[in-house]
Amino acid sequence: MARPPPLPGLVGRRNGRAVDRAIGWRLFLLLWHPALGAQARPPRRAPGGRWRSRRVFLLVRRTRAAAYAFAIRRGVVRVVGGGGQLLRPAPGEAAAAAAAGFGAAGEAGVAGAGLEAWRHPSGPARTQLGGQEGAGGWLVVGFLLCLFLLMPP
């Protein structure tokens, strides 16, 4: 039996900008990990004929679809069918993704050109910094965590 085509996948391109930290690692774990990613196969049948981990498989599939929808609503990614690049969605792509069941139409839009200014549905226009404005807090947290872990008992 022929293998079904892969689910829509995401391929990253950073361009010096940090991926939105609210979803970056979740997307990485859900979409790129070989066991949970876009190439994940359905579970094999157990010797008794029942699916060994059907519940887990359905949960992963549902969570992955929710991650796609959240990322598209945030304007971080576009869904591509057979490979491509991780880009901000063009105006028509949000509607196409919504028609495919990955998000609400019109929630991810592009505003402006030139300096790559774009607008979140819930926030101000962003520029090429793309989320790096608040990176100092994460540096402080990481530094304190390292101090805590390296302290002698």
Curated annotation (Swiss-Prot):
Cytoplasmic topological domain: 152-153
Transmembrane annotation, as ranges: 133-151
Topology in the lipid bilayer: Single-pass type I membrane protein
Assigned GO CC terms: mitochondrial membrane; nuclear membrane
Subcellular location: Nucleus membrane; Mitochondrion membrane; Cytoplasm
Segment forming the signal sequence: 1-40
Tissue: Ubiquitous. Highly expressed in testis.
Keywords, alphabetical: Cytoplasm, Membrane, Mitochondrion, Nucleus, Signal, Transmembrane, Transmembrane helix
Residues in compartment: Extracellular: 41-132
Descriptive protein name: Taurine up-regulated 1 protein
Annotated organism of origin: Homo sapiens (Human)
Gene field: TUG1
